[in-house]
Every structure is written in structure tokens, then in C-alpha cells.
Regions:
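PP2C/PPM-type serine/threonine phosphatase catalytic core
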Residues: 1-209
């Protein structure tokens, strides 16, 4: 993300996301309509345009590895990349994964209050609009710790989801007496995806426009 003379450029490769938080109407600190604007599009392999390019280059998109759709060489188990654009993945680039960024731009004004840049661990736990609402609420209390609070909220949501997954697996692996059919099922570990976020609070004065 780059801001030059109040013009914002969001430059993205991968599945991190950049979201702008706006408030229209109300005063500077509360009220008004809260709006989220996605300043990037997640570059997932299942996106129609990304999938088409990958297939034209001899790659395929499938779920050979359980979970998210990934990019593979045909009839192969590599590279198994869960994004359609990346930097430095040589094998993936041979089968249509691109290193070319997508660029979005916007002229900032006094309605624009903050920009959130986050890894997919944020957006898999909360929607863009949920994140914007959360930040607006927390920034009224303490801007300095907003990013930490957002990361903690997302981590908590991942942990709750993993508890439900564990409970479900134990239920389907239990016999009628409550004994585990698969002794290893109760020891399944569920990952929490990378949770990284940066919040940039914008200070554009009305008299600048």
C-alpha cells in the first residue's frame, strides 16, 4: 500500500487483503454510516480469471490436499499452492501462477478513516465489513492497540472453530458406547492460519478539498 499526495495505491500479490474504512455523515468520532471498501481482490486459484490462466499454462486447480483448492502440475502433487499469484515460487510459475500484482487506486478524502492490511488468517475469521465495524468501535477506545485487539479477536474465532471441528470428529468416530473407533481422532491438531494485520489511521482534513 502506498499513499502519494492523498492518493492511495493498493498493490497486491497473493491472498492478503487491503480494506478501507469510511464513515459518511456524523461527527469525526461517532455516528454516520460506516462503509467498508475492499481495495484488493484475493487472488485465489478458484477465481475464474486466475483459474483460466493456470489451466491455459498447463496447471490444474484441485483439492488433492484437503482444505482449500490449490494449484498443481497435472498428474503431480506439486506445488500445492493455495494462491494464484506469488513471488519466488518457481515451480508454480511454470504452471500459471503469476507474480504480476493487481493495482487499485483511490483518491482519499475526509470520509476515509483507516486502512486495514491483513493476511488471510484475518479474513478467514471475519468479513471485511465485520473488520471495519470492529475497528471503528475499538478506535474510539484506543487507536494504539486496535491491531492487537483485531488479531486477538480473529485468533479467538479460529480457536472456537477448531473446538467445533474437534467435537465433530470425536462424535463421528465414537461408537454407541462412546468409545473412540479411531484412537488418533481425539489427538487431531487444527492449525490457526497466519494472523497478521496493520491498521493505518488516515488524517485527511476537510479543508484539504
Amino acid at each position: 500500500m502506498l499513499i502519494v499526495d492523498n492518493k492511495m495505491f493498493a498493490i497486491n500479490v497473493g491472498d492478503s487483503r487491503c480494506v478501507l474504512g469510511q464513515r459518511k455523515g456524523g461527527d469525526e468520532k461517532k455516528g454516520g454510516e460506516k462503509i467498508c471498501i475492499e481495495m484488493s481482490i484475493d487472488q485465489k486459484p478458484m477465481r475464474d480469471d486466475e483459474k483460466k490462466r493456470i489451466q491455459e499454462k498447463g496447471g490444474e486447480v484441485s483439492e488433492k490436499i484437503p482444505g482449500a483448492p490449490r494449484v498443481f502440475r497435472k498428474n503431480d502433487e506439486v506445488p500445492g499452492l493455495a494462491v494464484a499469484r506469488s513471488i519466488g515460487d518457481i515451480v508454480a510459475h511454470e504452471v500459471g501462477v503469476s507474480c504480476e500484482p493487481e493495482v487499485f487506486e483511490k483518491e482519499l478524502d475526509s470520509d476515509d478513516h483507516f486502512i486495514v492490511i491483513g493476511s488471510d488468517g484475518i479474513w478467514d475469521a471475519m468479513s471485511s465489513c465485520e473488520v471495519v465495524g470492529f475497528v471503528f468501535q475499538k478506535m474510539e477506545e484506543n487507536k494504539e492497540i486496535c491491531s492487537r485487539l483485531l488479531a486477538e479477536e480473529c485468533r479467538n474465532r479460529w480457536e472456537v472453530l477448531n473446538l467445533f471441528k474437534q467435537k465433530y470428529i470425536m462424535e463421528i468416530n465414537s461408537n454407541k458406547d462412546g468409545e473412540m473407533k479411531d484412537k488418533n481422532a481425539q489427538h487431531n491438531n487444527f492449525d490457526i492460519d497466519d494472523i497478521t494485520c496493520i491498521i493505518d489511521f488516515i488524517n485527511i482534513e476537510k479543508e484539504d478539498y
